[in-house]
């Protein structure tokens, strides 16, 4: 099902609105990107009929881990916590469980602490805020199992939109850690990636930041 990018972006930015006040964009981006990742992975695995396999297998393992270890690590587990006390603590445990089973996610997905009272408030304030935040990611336009953004890469579009907005709101130059998709596409074409026939050729971006230029290079190859 096609979804308008304006709808997608509006819901993503609404999730940011829920966190304003307790922290600035350089901090709440970690919360939003974590939720976006969890929602995307959950939806995609559901769509493939492999919901019980929601995990990226640790490269150190040469066989599937115990199936029991795969459970309790999805966005649906966040949904089950809505309206409950200590929801932040529960969300942190779910994320920690996923990070423990996937060493590549250590220090990436678990840097945002959903039980931080200084940033999210305490007691009912935190519970209500996180419940509302989860509800936003349940909106139809954020259903990544079925939606396509006008034929484009929907998760890439969502990520680039957020990075652009975070860069602008934090007062930093957009080019400091984010290269607009339009610029990345032009650069990928200028260096002639599409005409390269050497399978061993590589692209180096020593200041890759969020990696948008490298992604566009792959698209052009």
Model-inferred region functions:
Residues 1-195, 199:
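Non-catalytic, mostly N-terminal accessory regions of nucleic-acid modification and defense proteins
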Residues 174, 208-210:
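Short glycine-rich loop/turn motifs that provide flexible caps or phosphate-binding loops at active sites
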Residues 198-207:
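Conserved class I S-adenosyl-L-methionine
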Residues 210-221:
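Conserved SAM-binding loop of SAM-dependent methyltransferases across substrates and taxa
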């Amino acid at each position: 099902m096609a979804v308008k990018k304006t709808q997608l972006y509006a819901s993503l930015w609404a999730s940011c609105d829920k966190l304003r006040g307790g922290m600035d964009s350089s901090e709440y981006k970690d919360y939003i990107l974590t939720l976006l990742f969890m929602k995307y992975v959950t939806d995609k695995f559901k769509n493939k009929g492999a919901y019980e396999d929601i995990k990226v297998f640790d490269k150190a393992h040469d066989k599937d881990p115990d199936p029991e270890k795969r459970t309790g690590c999805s966005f649906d587990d966040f949904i089950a916590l809505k309206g409950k006390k200590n929801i932040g603590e529960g969300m942190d445990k779910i994320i920690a469980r996923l990070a423990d089973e996937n060493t590549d996610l250590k220090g990436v997905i678990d840097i945002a602490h959903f039980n931080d009272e200084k940033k999210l408030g305490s007691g009912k304030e935190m519970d209500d805020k996180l419940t509302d935040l989860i509800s936003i990611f349940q909106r139809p336009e954020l259903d990544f199992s079925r939606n396509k953004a006008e034929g484009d890469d929907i998760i890439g579009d969502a990520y680039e939109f957020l990075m652009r907005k975070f860069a602008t709101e934090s007062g930093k130059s957009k080019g400091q850690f984010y290269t607009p998709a339009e610029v990345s596409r032009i650069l990928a074409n200028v260096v002639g990636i599409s005409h390269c026939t050497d399978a061993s050729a590589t692209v180096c971006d020593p200041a890759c930041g969020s990696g948008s230029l490298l992604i566009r290079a792959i698209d052009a190859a």
